[in-house]
Amino acid sequence: MMEESALLNDHVFSDALEPIVNIPRRTIGSNPQIDPCEMNGQIHFLTTAYFKNTEYERCLGMVKDMANLTGKIVLGSSWELACEYGRGETRSQLLAKKEKLSPTFFATNYESRWVGSSDACIVDVNKMLNLRTLPKAELKSDGKSEYYIGVDVARSTKTNNNQTSIVVGKVKRDKKDKVKHIQIVNIVNLPNGTNFTGQAIAVKRLQKLYNAVSVIIDINGLGVGLLDEVMKLHQDPITGEELIAFDTINTEHESDEAETLRCVWGIQAQGLNTDIIVNFINMVESGGLQLLEKVDQNAIANADSDFLTNRILPHVQTELLIEEVANLSLEQLNGGKLTVKRNSKSIDKDRYSALVYMIWYIMTQQNKSREEEEEFNIASICCFSSPKIR
């Protein structure tokens, strides 16, 4: 009997576990016998739904075998079956819980729905889950570390598809100043319909809180509107403090303000898609990316507003980030270029986009070792001697 079989990949099962149950047990003694009443050779898989993986493919195969009467059977149901028979929580209690829990958590644990992409997923979701090693979010700079901010600007003015996502990353370097880890210490999703002024103020607040080295903004399409806005002087409507105007590092856009902070890198992602995707895949495969730990869902249901916002919400946003990544399939275009496609249009990729923009910038613009930055001195490879006068 395989408990929580969704967590088991098919290679390990075929190599280490399946051979055990294929051999029936025998009695002890000089003439061991097989018990004819014991159900030998049967394998029972018990699991909740999960991200689509090899176990998902096994379930599909078993359903087809059951239809073809090959001796296999698949049973499953959602929370509604238990409610129908009066078991556990009531329908109203579960629907109220659905409003508070992560969509992925509720879909897999209560609705028996497998989530994500099983075909050409951009990265192995199990590897992504293994990156969740950070115990708690950071709500401001620790005073000594190096922070960067990635921003994906809403692509539409529609309220159901108008979320700007902001990802905060902390860089850990090795002895040669090369990037060793990028820790995602906070993720913020702005409310639907927030105008450019509100978005700019939110970005500036976060830049000030973390003393971020750079703010990476996608300036394709509507992103130019946010770029224009962050180059203006603002006053925080909550604290009343002045928020300095930003200026760009790599574009010809210039602020009209006399005093500016040159920290914005404008990225035009359409021409860099392949490099952006490859850098993201490399960070996941190498373990260089680190994410916030999975949060106890009971803590979400029982948390007060302040604790939920400041401590729990970044972990929930990380959960939604993984859901976005699991929903993406990798596609190869003509000429060998890469792009990603959403399998379910109901799941956006705002958090993913903000994350990969930031990773690309850090790995391509901020990843030079000390040796690479040292000035070239021709005297170090050539010998010169002063001429002798005869």
Residue map of PLM features:
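RNase H-like, metal-dependent nuclease domains and their acidic two-metal-ion catalytic environment used
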Residues: 2-11, 39-64, 85-250, 274, ...
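Conserved RecA-like P-loop NTPase helicase motor core
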Residues: 260-284
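Residue-level signal for alpha-helix termini/capping positions
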Residues: 22-26, 208, 285
